[in-house]
Design a protein with these regions (language model features):
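A short SAM/SAH-binding and catalytic strip from SAM-dependent methyltransferases
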Residues: 122-135
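Conserved S-adenosyl-L-methionine
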Residues: 202-213
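Conserved class I S-adenosyl-L-methionine
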Residues: 154-176
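A short glycine-rich, Lys/Arg-flanked "PGG" loop and its adjoining helix->strand segment in the class I
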Residues: 136-151
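Short conserved AdoMet
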Residues: 52, 133, 147
Length: 300
């Protein structure tokens, strides 16, 4: 039974909201991070390139489910959203209000396995990667749950320095880093991310950049700073201080999983002994996966 306007207002006020939703009757949820509103609109626009019709969809870091509900609206046959901090507002209010079949689970992405979750045609992975302490393991967990020819839409804070675009880069800021946020710890650049996912049989299909913003160190002082300033007078085309590494923006990518796309389908060692990709995957799992760590019998 649909709630009245007064009941909706009262219900919305019981929860804290990350996403903004129009519930009708002039009632909306009030986001705690309204500065992200334009970025969410940007993400939704980019997702027009994804065909959700009849697809099984996983939304990682779903929060209140903005993209989960949108995937369902665009024709997905099944949508599962996972988050470390399950949105009770989404479960108790939004899903019933929208008469939605979206499922939401409190779950860490490192717990993802095909055995427990199955595989998905589309995986949405927005605003999470740059928070991961173990990005390679997290990406592997996700790709293992992606169907062959499946699509992953990945959005993250990225290093977009034009001076390093030809270098496979992963920046892990520490101490007095200009990234200036304690949970923001993993910043790939586009080439670094594409190369990493290529090793996991994923091909980059499309890329978009949202409002590049330059983040720089505070102006340096002392003899070394004065020497650099002198160098810039002599070589005026040098990049501005701090921009060489620390250009940051949000980017969204579409990757497609294709078996055999990895350039390292076989691994050559100095002994010229060759091992299959299946052996390499088994080695990775036995080394890093706590559930299979006991199985050390790896055969070429």
């Amino acid at each position: 039974m649909k709630k009245t306007r007064a009941e909706l207002i009262e219900a919305v006020g019981r929860y804290r909201w990350y996403h903004t939703f129009d519930l009708g009757e002039g009632v909306t949820t009030t986001s705690q991070v309204p500065l992200f509103k334009d970025m969410w609109a940007f993400n939704l626009k980019c997702l027009e390139s994804v065909d959700f019709r009849g697809k099984r969809v996983l939304d990682i870091g779903c929060r209140d489910g903005l993209f989960s509900f949108e995937a369902e609206r665009r024709g997905a046959r099944e949508v599962i959203g996972i988050d470390n901090d399950l949105s009770t507002g989404a479960v108790e209010l939004l899903i019933p209000h929208f008469d939605s079949k979206v499922q939401m689970r409190q779950m860490n992405l490192y717990e993802l396995t095909p055995e427990t979750m199955g595989r998905f045609d589309v995986i949405l992975f927005f605003g999470v990667l740059y928070h991961l302490r173990y990005p390679f393991w997290g990406l592997k967990r996700i790709i293992d749950c992606l169907e062959e020819q499946g699509v992953m839409a990945l959005e993250s804070g990225m290093n977009v320095s034009p001076y390093l675009k030809d270098v496979e880069l992963l920046v892990c800021p520490v101490e007095r880093s200009p990234y200036n946020e304690p949970t923001s710890c993993t910043f790939f650049n586009q080439l670094g991310l594409a190369t990493t996912l290529r090793s996991m049989d994923c091909r980059l299909e499309q890329a978009w950049t949202f409002r590049p913003e330059r983040t720089q160190f505070k102006p340096a002082r002392g003899p070394w700073a004065r020497l650099k300033q002198l160098g810039r007078r002599i070589f005026p085309k040098l990049p501005p201080s701090g921009s060489l590494i620390h250009d940051v923006a949000r980017q969204l990518f579409l990757f497609r999983k294709e078996a055999g796309h990895a350039t390292s389908a076989e691994y050559a060692y100095p002994t010229q002994e060759r091992f299959s990709k299946q052996w390499a995957d088994a080695y990775w799992n036995a080394t890093h996966d706590e559930h299979t760590r006991g199985d050390r019998k790896l055969k070429p």
